[in-house]
Regions:
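Bacterial N-terminal signal peptides that target proteins for export
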Residues: 1-8, 18
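Domain-scale selection of a single, long terminal region
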Residues: 1, 10-12, 108
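C-terminal segment of classical bacterial N-terminal signal peptides
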Residues: 13-21
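Amphipathic, charged alpha-helical segments and their helix-to-coil junctions
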Residues: 21-194
């Protein structure tokens, strides 16, 4: 009986360390990627960034085009009000003020809509890029033998051999040859029937 217990304890002692060893976490093999470089040097990213800059410049140009005549009209109305020296404005001047306020509100709404569209376009571009990057990270990690990838801006220091940015850029150029720079139209809320 004593021999049986000793044999069983020896078998258990031999089996338990191998079970614990199977639970061990593998050593980290880390790769780093510079996402700023990826998104600024991939071919379609450069094209999309130029299109966004053009949209933003168009918005700024439109803002100036709307502001100039409004400012001129506002000065003329203010001069007419000042000329009254505190008297009540006549119906024509009140009508002119109301028309000016309507134009001003319409211009603000137009600019807000364009600004919203530019922001939606930017988010849509970023989504297209990030949708492609997820699988690319996995592919590059497997190809380079890494089991962890970190953005280079989150590291204190790293060796050049850990940098896989060029691999990610090359894969992104292949996976995303072009980017749509106009977000699809937003779904309209359904109107309730009668």
């Amino acid at each position: 009986m004593k021999t049986l217990l000793i044999s069983a304890s020896l078998v258990a002692a031999a089996v338990l360390p191998s079970a614990a060893q199977a639970q061990a976490i593998p050593a980290a093999v880390i790769a780093v990627v510079d996402l700023d470089k990826v998104t600024s040097t991939c071919n379609s990213c450069k094209t999309a960034a130029a299109a966004l800059r053009s949209q933003a410049q168009g918005l700024q140009t439109r803002q100036q085009a709307l502001a100039t005549p409004l400012q001129t009209e506002q000065k003329a109305i203010q001069a007419a009000i000042d000329a009254l020296k505190g008297k009540e404005p006549d119906a024509a001047l009140r009508s002119r003020v109301q028309a000016f306020q309507a134009k001003e509100q319409q211009a603000a709404q137009e600019l807000q809509a364009q600004q919203t569209q530019v922001q939606r376009n930017q988010q849509y571009i970023q989504k297209q890029i990030s949708d492609k990057l997820g699988p690319i990270y996995t592919q590059v990690m497997q190809r380079r033998g890494a089991n962890m990838m970190v953005e280079i801006g989150q590291t204190l220091a790293s060796g050049q051999t850990l940098d896989v940015t060029n691999d990610v850029v090359a894969a992104l150029n292949t996976a995303l040859p072009s980017i749509s720079t106009t977000a699809p139209a937003q779904a309209r809320p359904a109107t309730q029937g009668r």
